[in-house]
Amino acid sequence: MKKTDWSQPLRNRLAEDYFPKMIEFINQTYQEGKVYPPENQIFRAIELTPLAQTKVIIVGQDPYPQPGKAQGLAFSYPATFKVNRPDSIVNIQKELREEGFSKDDSDLTAWAEQGVLLLNAVLTVPEFASNAHAGKIWEPLTDEIIKIASDDERPKVFILWGGFARKKAKLIDGSKHLILEAAHPSPLSASRGFFGSHPFSKTNEFLVESGQSPIDWSK
């Protein structure tokens, strides 16, 4: 993990033995088999989006388990893959178009660089084994990231899609931050509350009202 302004708050909050256990878990799992994202991208979300620049937090579950797809950013998918994109990112693009934003590619790096923390609750996944690392090591870390963002004074938007992410609402101070909850953008649930929820325009309205610059979701 590269040193960022997330580093010290995390070390202050987590148990003293957490990071040695985390390093042991990473070393062991990456030696035993194919695990995604690449090891140097595990913490890419907090490396690309410092706490001081974080305006929006989108919570995902875990990385894509297919080779070459996971980038260390929730929902983001390499632009080099033009076909067979995950249905969730396709539905996110549909909602963007409905809200007047045009984003043709599925790489969300530019969002992260604007202050959108794309945080998976579980940061690694074995090949073709979705959610297999849930409950292993990551949740104490990612829950604390959410709490640190919530405790920060600058108003933020927390976007929680689906039952898994919505459970994180209890970690957030809703009196100063905007919490946007909706169905997950997967095909199973997108038509039951994700489409038409307008998370991107609502986010920008809140940011502008709180004196911050909006996100260019088209990037």
UniProtKB/Swiss-Prot annotation:
It comes from the Bacteria. PROSITE patterns: U_DNA_GLYCOSYLASE. Its main location: cytoplasm. Its EC number is 3.2.2.27. One of its GO terms (molecular function) is uracil DNA N-glycosylase activity. One of its GO terms (biological process) is base-excision repair, AP site formation via deaminated base removal. GO terms for cellular component: cytoplasm. HAMAP family: UDG. Excises uracil residues from the DNA which can arise as a result of misincorporation of dUMP residues by DNA polymerase or due to deamination of cytosine. Belongs to the uracil-DNA glycosylase (UDG) superfamily. UNG family. This is Uracil-DNA glycosylase.
